[in-house]
């Protein structure tokens, strides 16, 4: 049966109860009854649809591991990030063709999705193993993984002693036309604006924009271009990507500038999930020790207590999560507008 036909026939998509309301009732059962009921209902649903900003390879690895645990649930996946994911979800809501069951995207990008009414709270039993800073009180967001943001540099083009040591160093004329940056680093922008203050922050950003940055789609692309020598410095690299490339012998090293921050990538329940019981099992498993251990195998940092990190050096210098007030939809909208006007005025 096609996904579209499945949605049209799915009572969860059009019933009065949202996915969160349904699962909240199930959560009142004893752990044993809850487990058995979820498994029974999920088996009848037969599938779950996962929207994620992870790489295709990582999504496939995660899906395969989940299938090993729950072979009766097929995992449908959609890989995207940023504004494209938001636009897709908005279009589906308007058309009343809600495909997503579980959504994984950065916290700041999750804000407009929540504002659309596309998310529901879900208090997974696994949430108790996550520190308070890595989940919201209402149950909408739980950290799936954390992405420390680092500055990278091509070691063939930049000597260690010459690499920028702070954000002011990026304004040095010698780096003009030599720097790459992701074109949607809204959390990075928000953290620095809060760190500098509004007036100083805007002055800094305008001066940085005058350095003729090469704006690229996505941090992975920034890292690849940096390794290829198409730039000397990458301002916004994912920490795990930088360390993986360095581990493989690429001419790349990294610096943790101050403020050093980590972007939380959340995992969330879609409000109108067509397969709510399978969604609950997928969420529970993804946040479990087993699921989180697989996520660390990708080099990503996780917040769950007791899970061994692949790259612990990324957390040796204390990082802070993107402040939750930066994730407020109204604040995020202002930050996005400011960033675009400064760095991408022609788009």
Give, region by region, the residue ranges found by the protein language model.
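A ligand-binding cleft/hinge motif common to bilobed small-molecule-binding domains
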Residues: 109-112, 232-251
